[in-house]
Design a protein with these regions (language model features):
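Alpha-helical transmembrane segments of multi-pass membrane proteins
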Residues: 1-182
Length: 182
């Protein structure tokens, strides 16, 4: 975790490779065997790759969990004790609907996507602070509870990029309690 706090996954992987190469070299020497060129070559290659990658993402994790992560420009790449979080650069485009339906009105907004471990993606939508500018959320299936009961108190588990908070604000909820675990 210390390496992930100070570098990125690729640099940490290269560092682990370098440590493994040193360990292999030590075991070979302890057994009285020649190290040959393979271990020093691996060590040098890992250290060079780590040095190139330590502050940027020259070598980026593109396939976490054996699937292509979004190949877009990254604003931030962060780690915590159990997840890799990518925040992509904001883009202007069609409003994001989890389920807008065929008759959903088309709105445009600025949004950035956040992806956790290459799996769980969520939009972060730019908002001007005016509840009237949130009408676009009313066309999403996730706002069905608010159509049935506007103005109720709201509890949200898994805030993500805040999309559910925007829906609660749109509905006029007087109190919103939100919890994010990751």
């Amino acid at each position: 975790v210390l390496l992930l706090d100070t570098t990125n996954l690729s640099a940490a992987a290269f560092a682990a490779t370098a440590v493994a190469a040193l360990g292999a070299l030590a075991f070979r020497r302890a057994a009285g065997l020649s190290a040959g060129l393979a271990v020093p070559f691996t060590l040098v290659l890992a250290l060079v790759a780590m040095g190139v990658n330590v502050r940027g993402e020259a070598v980026r994790v593109m396939y976490p969990k054996n699937r292509l992560a979004w190949n877009k420009p990254v604003l931030r790449s962060l780690w915590n004790s159990h997840a890799h979080i990518l925040a992509f650069l904001p883009e202007v485009g069609p409003a994001f609907y989890w389920g807008g339906g065929d008759g959903a009105a088309q709105f445009t907004n600025t949004q950035a996507f956040v992806v956790v471990d290459g799996e769980a993606g969520t939009p972060m939508t730019e908002w001007d602070g005016n509840a009237a500018s949130l009408d676009w959320v009313s066309y999403d299936v996730t706002t069905l509870p608010y159509h049935l009961r506007k103005g109720g108190r709201v509890g949200i588990v898994g805030v993500g990029g805040g999309r559910d908070i925007l829906a609660a604000i749109w509905s006029g909820s007087p109190a919103i309690t939100a919890v994010e675990i990751n």
